[in-house]
Amino acid sequence: MATSLMKSSLALHAAPRPRSVRLSATSSRVDSPQVSVVLGTQWGDEGKGKLVDNLAQQFDIVARAQGGANAGHTIYDETGRKFALHLVPSGILNPKATCVIGNGVVLHLPGLFEEIRRLKEKGVQVDGRLLVSDRAHLLFDLHKEIDGLREAELAGDGKQIGTTKRGIGPAYSSKATRNGLRVCDLFDRATFKTKLTNLAADGAKRFGEKFAYDVEGDIAAYEKLAEEIRPFVVDTVEYLHEALQSGKRILIEGANATMLDLDFGTYPYVTSSNPSIGGIATGLGLPPSSYDDIVGVAKAYTTRVGAGPYPTEIHGKLAEDLRAVGHEYGTTTGRPRRIGWMDIVALRYACKINGVTHINLTKLDVLDNLEEIQVGVGYKTKEGKMLKSVPADLHTLENVEVVYETLPGWQADISAARQWAQLPAAAQAYVQRIEDLIGIPVKWIGVGPGRDALVVKPEAPKK
């Protein structure tokens, strides 16, 4: 991909003002939102789990709306212990919070119970604190099998997507073609057996002898799993609306990210759900009118796992160094992540789609050793046309020339900073430049992996 180090004019990249946040008649919903949403604004792995873990201390309920075990959230408790979560919401480390897995999630029960087991081994109380939607779709080992077979076919044509092979796409495919099984189906054994047998027959018909799935074994296994999951299962739509009416505070944890969204991402190199704001509404049954605060989480640089266009990608030793410093390996797959500069065009696009009110800028400390830092502020076509947003056409996106601004680095260790004033002037300038370019305030800045490694940026005086 061609790039040019060109300085942009402020006028060219001026961003719209952030939308105002609704205030209730009695209190500021900005300072104390009843419903707050945390979403990824890049290609995933932005550090959403850490912010959710921090904010969860202030909320009664933490809910997941979409995705499955392809989402990997890494968080640390106050003692520095590491927790890698895939299905259980990150709020589980707050003993006062109830965690909800909504109807939009595709749920692999063996994986869920393994995650619960690991949490209990570390002393985390889960029973009575985790609720699962009766409308959530089930993800079976057959979906994982199909995922691997599909990727193998695509690899033969050189068109593999680079999925996590966790069965997410096939599970959502079953949902869309209306032959999927939901959690509520677990409790009618005859119906469950018939539906799963039919689903397995479809897989065998499609892939023939390559499809190695023990349907009878899974039917027997799920008889036991049905009883294990029963205490967790509720009508989460009714539960959440009752909580809303009673004044409880709800934190919604997005999985994956907007640039992987099925509709708005770099299709077909995307996930199979909607990690944007629309997926929150359909994945939980809470209307958009109830959202008081929408936080967009973005790394101070960018990463991506798997194939697909990536305009600001960095190659060579610099990418290797940043990957090593940032520990950029997938929580779910362990694959090395691709590394890139901050992409303002993509970030502004994601903020527009989601109605983002605040930004959490993460992993600023990873850039500590750089003399200069580049920020992608514009896309230019081969014909010299400046693009206002992320183009839908992949050929166009793959061949854009990125317009960069170059900012000075700070070359200092910022991991001990806990206040805005403790950050070097160049680090402050970098954060402020990003804020100015997207027109949305940066509220939190991550300066390390620990729970407390977070700087709150003071609000700018109102004009």
Swiss-Prot record:
Superkingdom in the source lineage: Eukaryota
Sequence positions that bind substrate: T331, T332, T333, G334, R335, P336, R337
EC number: 6.3.4.4
InterPro entries linked to this entry: Adenylosuccin_syn_GTP-bd (IPR018220), Adenylosuccin_syn_Lys_AS (IPR033128), Adenylosuccinate_synth_dom1 (IPR042109), Adenylosuccinate_synth_dom2 (IPR042110), Adenylosuccinate_synth_dom3 (IPR042111), Adenylosuccinate_synthetase (IPR001114), P-loop_NTPase (IPR027417)
Disulfide-bonded cysteines: none
Binding residue positions for GTP: 44-50, 72-74, 337, 363-365, 446-448
Cited SMART domains: Adenylsucc_synt
Residues engaged in binding IMP: D45, E46, G47, K48, N70, A71, G72, H73, T164, R178, N256, T271, R335
Pathway as given in its UniProt record: Purine metabolism; AMP biosynthesis via de novo pathway; AMP from IMP: step 1/2
Membrane keyword on record: no
Keyword Plastid in annotation: yes
Binding site for Mg(2+): D45, G72
Residues of the active site: D45 (proton acceptor), H73 (proton donor)
Summary of subunit composition and partner proteins: Homodimer.
PANTHER family in alphabetical order: ADENYLOSUCCINATE SYNTHETASE
Name of protein: Adenylosuccinate synthetase, chloroplastic
